[in-house]
Amino acid sequence: MNFRRRLCTAALIAALPLASQAQNNTLLLNSVLAPQNPMTKMIVKPWAEKIAQVTEGRVKVDVAPSSLAAPQQQLASVNKGVFDIAYQFHGLLTDQVKLNQIAQLPFVNTTARGSSVALWRTYQKHFAKANELGEVQVLALFVQPPGVMFGMKGPIDGMDKLKGRKVYALPGVPSAMMESAGAAVVAAPGARSYEIVSGKTVDAFVGYPTSDAEGLKTLSYATDVTDIPGNLTAVSWVLFMNKKRWAALSEKDRKAIESISGEAFAQGMKQYDDLETKVRSEAAAKGIKFHMANDAFVKELQTLATPITQAWLKDASSRGVNGQEALDFYRAQAAANR
């Protein structure tokens, strides 16, 4: 067993009563985001805690107190048995996972709940057979509220505010869009955005929602927030478990865990929509200005988006998937469940 996992597991088990150790099949979940991050507090940790309830105490999930692996190493670490369960940002899986990138495409998303339901249903209907994630059990797919543009020196209200400017962007679609717009892009996982934004070496940051900016402590550096009609992109994730550990659970316990995962997990993302509304209201009260991009700016962004969407359709075809059919289905589901 990996040394770091052995050390963490030993510490966790030491705190458990002996009777509990005997009764529980204890799994270790790694949260790549900090304990105070909304994703951890509202979504991942409550789900982990609920597993003990739905399995009547037969399965327990402990959440590591801090991440045991780099953001880009979550999938590999679960495969190696460093920990049993993890979740990873799709933008850090672009080489291996092409199909699930649908949720990060420009102009396809609605709300966190709508997009999460759409992604799960699209995966089940169109993508699962491709098995892009390999030897893990996919437990949930989820999408955060749409990402926006944060201006640090005034609003981003046109291409002239991007061209030649230094912009932090999440890897994947956000960074690709900003590069196409002529920005000098600094791409890194969201967990690193604070050090980049707080250092004031960029003029703007793009890709995640206002609620995440609050959680990542970057919102206070923004003067303006620009929303894009139809939404520029969204941050999407996959939650997975080591296949051998999953197979070792009883069928009854697997079904119990599935009952709070998948579609149920996606529906629960409404909490993130509610948080987004609250944080935006509080930010406006503190003086941050919110803007809706004008038609001319949106049209220019849509032009930049076309080759990104076309590239995804080509990737889908290479995986044996009718990309246009999947994309139409995703959009319809996102709109119907917003």
UniProtKB/Swiss-Prot annotation:
Give GO terms for biological process. monoatomic ion transport
This entry's comment on induction and repression of expression is:
Induced by TSA. Transcriptionally regulated by TsaQ and TsaR.
Does Transport show up as a keyword for this record? Answer: yes
Annotated signal sequence is 1-22
UniProt entry keywords in alphabetical sequence: Cell outer membrane, Ion transport, Membrane, Plasmid, Porin, Signal, Transmembrane, Transport
Q: Which InterPro entries match?
A: DctP_fam, TRAP_DctP_sf
Q: Where in the cell is it found?
A: Cell outer membrane
Name a GO molecular-function annotation: porin activity
Disulfide cysteine pairs (residue numbers): none
PANTHER family given for it? BLL6794 PROTEIN (PTHR33376:SF15), PTHR33376
NCBIfam families attached here?
Answer: TRAP_S1
Subunit structure, as described in the record: Part of a two-component transport system composed of TsaT and TsaS.
Task: Identify this protein by name.
Answer: Outer membrane transporter protein TsaT
Q: Which gene encodes it?
A: tsaT
